[in-house]
Amino acid sequence: MLKRAIAPVRNVFQSIARAGTAGYPPDTVRRLKILNVIAALIALTNSIYALQLAMGDYETMKPVVWINLVLSAIAASVPLTHRISETAGGLILVTAEFVALLGFTAYFGRSGGAPMQYLVAAAAPFVIFGLDRLRLVIA
């Protein structure tokens, strides 16, 4: 009974993971599935942040709300970019994250904690691009 109840949720997650991966070799599909799940989590969490901030003090937090919404839209579009190339989605996501961090740092200042996220963001390219593209990761 539990399997039947969980099946629709599992199917949704599998669909998200598989989106845009058709036609790629198995190793690439595995990496793109991971990227799709990461992008979906980014889209979901940034949407939640935007909603929370908008419901609190929208006028004060307006720039942060919009940065989060734009980042959510970009992250949600990552599976579509796999049709361009296997690295396009990762490049777009990493670039958007770094630009968003710059925006958060500009808004909150250096003491706001956003600069600490650059340490976390430095590890993301290893997951997104894999060790096969070490030059791209280092760049």
Predicted feature residues:
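Non-catalytic regulatory/interaction regions at protein termini and inter-domain linkers
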Residues: M1-T28, M116
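The cytoplasmic-loop to transmembrane-helix boundary for the fourth helix
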Residues: I128-A139
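Phenylalanine-focused residue identity feature
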Residues: L2, F13, Y24, F98, ...
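Hydrophobic transmembrane alpha-helices and their membrane-interface boundaries in multi-pass
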Residues: K33-S111, Q117-A124, I138-A139
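Short functional linear motifs
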Residues: T28-V29, L134
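Compositionally biased, intrinsically disordered low-complexity regions
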Residues: A22, S111-P115, D132
